[in-house]
Amino acid sequence: MRYPQFYDMYRDAIKNTWTVDEIDFSTDLNDLDSKITPAERHLVNRLVAFFATGDSIVANNLVLNLYQHINAPEARMYLSRQLYEEALHVQFYLTLLDNYIPDMAEREAAFAAVENIPSIKQKADFCFKYMSSLNGVDELNTKDERRQFLMNLICFATCIEGLFFFAAFAYV
């Protein structure tokens, strides 16, 4: 095994397994109806929509860019587990949207936030810029190709997961 740290990360991630079905949303629904203001509810709806679309973008980057260029089996095991986590997060946020926003038109408007709300659209465009920077890069042979790959990795690990998501979680 060339990179035992990835195998250790994979094993640690397996220990952290959970499912959306384990979560009881009934208390949240009561709180949404009786304990928060309309402005706070609006914020919750926006955050959930942002997280659902954001984690979908992160999952796409894992599949389209990282997996292609990371070939060590133990590293791919960890990436596969991370992809599972991203899918689980998307399932969780979709379930939240289904529960928190029962009106289909409101739910569709929440999902359209990635296209219609300037701050969310700017974040998505930032992600797409770095995702598309690796289009056509089949191998990491040149210094520029490796730089593009590292920029993608830094963008997603630091800016998106570390800044965009954590800043949004601070509201919660």
Task: Please annotate each region the language model reported.
Residues 1-172:
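Non-heme di-metal
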